[in-house]
Protein backbone atom coordinates (compact mmCIF):
# COMPACT_ATOMS: atom_id res chain seq x y z
CA UNK A 1 0.00 0.00 0.00
CA UNK A 2 1.42 3.39 -0.93
CA UNK A 3 1.83 6.11 1.65
CA UNK A 4 -0.83 8.78 1.58
CA UNK A 5 0.27 12.38 1.26
CA UNK A 6 -0.17 13.78 4.80
CA UNK A 7 -0.85 17.29 3.50
CA UNK A 8 -3.60 16.06 1.18
CA UNK A 9 -5.14 13.87 3.89
CA UNK A 10 -5.07 16.64 6.49
CA UNK A 11 -6.56 19.18 4.07
CA UNK A 12 -9.38 16.79 3.13
CA UNK A 13 -9.99 15.97 6.80
CA UNK A 14 -10.13 19.64 7.80
CA UNK A 15 -12.57 20.49 5.01
CA UNK A 16 -14.80 17.56 5.97
CA UNK A 17 -14.63 18.21 9.73
CA UNK A 18 -15.52 21.90 9.60
CA UNK A 19 -18.18 21.62 6.90
CA UNK A 20 -19.82 18.88 9.00
CA UNK A 21 -19.44 20.94 12.19
CA UNK A 22 -21.05 23.95 10.51
CA UNK A 23 -23.99 22.05 9.02
CA UNK A 24 -24.62 18.86 11.04
CA UNK A 25 -22.64 18.52 14.27
CA UNK A 26 -24.17 15.12 15.09
CA UNK A 27 -22.50 13.88 11.91
CA UNK A 28 -19.10 14.29 13.58
CA UNK A 29 -19.75 11.12 15.62
CA UNK A 30 -18.27 8.95 12.87
CA UNK A 31 -14.91 10.71 13.21
CA UNK A 32 -14.40 9.70 16.84
CA UNK A 33 -14.05 6.38 18.69
CA UNK A 34 -14.56 5.38 22.32
CA UNK A 35 -10.89 6.03 23.16
CA UNK A 36 -11.03 9.50 21.57
CA UNK A 37 -10.56 12.53 23.79
CA UNK A 38 -11.63 16.13 23.25
CA UNK A 39 -10.23 18.97 25.33
CA UNK A 40 -12.56 21.91 24.74
CA UNK A 41 -11.40 25.13 26.38
CA UNK A 42 -9.64 23.05 29.05
CA UNK A 43 -12.50 20.59 29.68
CA UNK A 44 -11.52 16.97 28.96
CA UNK A 45 -14.21 14.76 27.44
CA UNK A 46 -13.78 11.13 26.37
CA UNK A 47 -15.83 8.83 24.16
CA UNK A 48 -18.00 9.36 21.10
CA UNK A 49 -21.29 10.06 22.89
CA UNK A 50 -19.78 12.49 25.38
CA UNK A 51 -17.86 14.36 22.68
CA UNK A 52 -20.89 14.68 20.40
CA UNK A 53 -23.03 15.73 23.39
CA UNK A 54 -20.54 18.51 24.13
CA UNK A 55 -20.33 19.71 20.54
CA UNK A 56 -24.09 19.69 20.03
CA UNK A 57 -24.73 21.50 23.33
CA UNK A 58 -22.59 24.53 22.49
CA UNK A 59 -24.56 27.75 23.01
CA UNK A 60 -24.94 28.57 19.31
CA UNK A 61 -26.84 26.82 16.56
CA UNK A 62 -25.21 28.29 13.50
CA UNK A 63 -21.58 29.06 12.81
CA UNK A 64 -19.08 29.16 9.99
CA UNK A 65 -15.42 28.25 10.30
CA UNK A 66 -12.96 30.14 8.10
CA UNK A 67 -9.66 28.27 8.05
CA UNK A 68 -6.46 30.33 7.91
CA UNK A 69 -3.76 27.67 8.27
CA UNK A 70 -3.45 23.88 8.32
CA UNK A 71 -0.15 22.33 9.39
CA UNK A 72 0.46 18.61 9.65
CA UNK A 73 3.16 16.18 10.65
CA UNK A 74 3.35 12.39 10.48
CA UNK A 75 3.07 10.98 13.99
CA UNK A 76 4.67 7.81 15.22
CA UNK A 77 5.06 4.28 13.91
CA UNK A 78 1.29 3.71 13.65
CA UNK A 79 1.03 6.19 10.75
CA UNK A 80 -0.90 8.76 12.73
CA UNK A 81 -0.96 12.46 11.90
CA UNK A 82 -0.93 15.65 13.89
CA UNK A 83 -3.02 18.40 12.32
CA UNK A 84 -2.95 21.95 13.66
CA UNK A 85 -5.60 24.38 12.46
CA UNK A 86 -6.06 28.09 13.03
CA UNK A 87 -8.82 30.30 11.79
CA UNK A 88 -11.89 32.36 12.54
CA UNK A 89 -15.24 31.21 13.85
CA UNK A 90 -18.18 33.37 12.79
CA UNK A 91 -21.27 32.92 14.94
CA UNK A 92 -24.67 33.77 13.50
CA UNK A 93 -25.73 37.27 14.50
CA UNK A 94 -22.29 38.26 15.80
CA UNK A 95 -20.41 41.09 14.14
CA UNK A 96 -16.89 39.96 15.02
CA UNK A 97 -15.42 36.55 14.36
CA UNK A 98 -13.65 34.62 17.12
CA UNK A 99 -10.12 33.39 16.50
CA UNK A 100 -9.51 29.73 17.28
CA UNK A 101 -6.85 27.05 17.20
CA UNK A 102 -7.50 23.33 17.08
CA UNK A 103 -5.18 20.34 17.09
CA UNK A 104 -6.18 16.88 15.90
CA UNK A 105 -4.24 13.65 16.35
CA UNK A 106 -5.55 11.40 13.61
CA UNK A 107 -5.04 7.65 13.73
CA UNK A 108 -5.59 5.19 10.89
CA UNK A 109 -8.51 2.77 10.91
CA UNK A 110 -8.27 -0.80 9.59
CA UNK A 111 -10.55 0.35 6.75
CA UNK A 112 -7.91 2.78 5.50
CA UNK A 113 -9.38 6.05 6.74
CA UNK A 114 -8.63 8.05 9.88
CA UNK A 115 -10.36 8.82 13.14
CA UNK A 116 -9.74 11.57 15.69
CA UNK A 117 -7.83 10.15 18.65
CA UNK A 118 -7.12 13.53 20.27
CA UNK A 119 -8.82 16.87 19.65
CA UNK A 120 -7.84 20.08 21.47
CA UNK A 121 -9.81 23.28 20.85
CA UNK A 122 -9.09 26.79 22.14
CA UNK A 123 -10.46 30.20 21.38
CA UNK A 124 -7.62 32.71 21.01
CA UNK A 125 -8.31 35.90 22.89
CA UNK A 126 -6.38 39.03 21.98
UniProtKB/Swiss-Prot annotation:
Q: Which SUPFAM superfamilies match?
A: NTF2-like
Q: Which residues cross the membrane?
A: none
Domain of life of the native organism: Eukaryota
Q: Give the UniProt tissue specificity note.
A: Expressed in roots, stems, leaves and flowers, and, at low levels, in siliques.
Keywords for this protein: Acetylation, Cytoplasm, Nucleus, Protein transport, Transport
The NTF2 domain extends over 9-123
The primary location reported for this protein is cytoplasm
Q: Which PROSITE patterns match?
A: NTF2_DOMAIN (PS50177)
Subcellular location(s): the record lists: Cytoplasm; Nucleus; Nucleus envelope
**Where in the sequence is N-acetylserine found?**
2
Instruction: Give the record's GO biological process terms.
Output: protein import into nucleus
InterPro entries assigned to the protein according to its UniProt record, in alphabetical order: NTF2 (IPR045875), NTF2-like_dom_sf (IPR032710), NTF2_dom (IPR002075), Nuclear_transport_factor_2_euk (IPR018222)
UniProt-listed PANTHER family: NUCLEAR TRANSPORT FACTOR 2
Q: What is the protein's quaternary organization?
A: Interacts with RAN1.
Q: What does this protein do?
A: Facilitates protein transport into the nucleus. Interacts with various nucleoporins and with Ran-GDP. Could be part of a multicomponent system of cytosolic factors that assemble at the pore complex during nuclear import.
- What this protein is called in its record is Nuclear transport factor 2B
Designated gene of the protein? NTF2B
Amino acid sequence: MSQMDPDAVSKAFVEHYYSTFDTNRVGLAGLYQEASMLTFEGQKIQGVQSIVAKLTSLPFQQCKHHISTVDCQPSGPASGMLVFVSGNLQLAGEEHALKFSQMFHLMPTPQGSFYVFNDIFRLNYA
